[in-house]
């Protein structure tokens, strides 16, 4: 078996993209993101590669949407999970800063 070289961010995106639920469907359907200092270089690039299916071992693209507000992204991810009867979910990421705490507040739902 050949060695696959990935950065930590690429490995995380690849890992998220292959998680399956009990029905055999993709569990993490995509990612909401606000890019800024702290996550634009590593994670942003890995999500871009995942969006276009350019990461080794990915069989289908990993969608990424750019959000405008951290709390809204978290609420959207929660609504998606509830609409799918919690059989599927969305990942959410933002840069480090005051907006990141808004995701924690939204997660209290």
Go through each PLM region and give its residues.
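Thiamine diphosphate
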Residues: 1-101, 105, 109
